[in-house]
Amino acid sequence: MAKVSAVEKNKRREIMVKRYAARRARLKAIVMDQKISLEERFKASVQLAELPRNSAKVRVRNRCEVSGRPRAYYRKLKMSRIALRELGSVGHIPGIIKSSW
């Protein structure tokens, strides 16, 4: 099990990303647009830098929904390899069975 504080911090970051997503996308579009004057682009760049760091999508870590583990994460299932193995072996995940050949 991961530390509860780490999991909660990641949840707060996810909320912050959703809250600032539209504003961040608008400012990034202005910064990247070559047709806009350099002064306006610089102003947008400064505004982008003033946004909270945790509002950047890069700061969010994929974590297992079951255990909170940050590594060995399967995106489709939203869980770690360990949780996948445990839940799959007892039959709690539809379509997942232990292989034998």
Curated annotation (Swiss-Prot):
Gene3D superfamilies membership: 1.10.287.1480
Classification via InterPro entries: Ribosomal_uS14, Ribosomal_uS14_bac/plastid, Ribosomal_uS14_CS
UniProtKB keywords: Ribonucleoprotein, Ribosomal protein, RNA-binding, rRNA-binding
Keyword Amino-acid biosynthesis: no
Gene Ontology molecular function: any one: structural constituent of ribosome
UniProt key word RNA-binding: yes
PROSITE patterns in the cross-refs: RIBOSOMAL_S14
One cellular component (GO) term of this entry: cytoplasm
Function recorded in the entry: Binds 16S rRNA, required for the assembly of 30S particles and may also be responsible for determining the conformation of the 16S rRNA at the A site.
Record text on subunit structure and interactions: Part of the 30S ribosomal subunit. Contacts proteins S3 and S10.
PANTHER family with a match to the protein in the record: 30S RIBOSOMAL PROTEIN S14, SMALL RIBOSOMAL SUBUNIT PROTEIN US14M
Family note: Belongs to the universal ribosomal protein uS14 family.
Name of the protein this chain belongs to: Small ribosomal subunit protein uS14
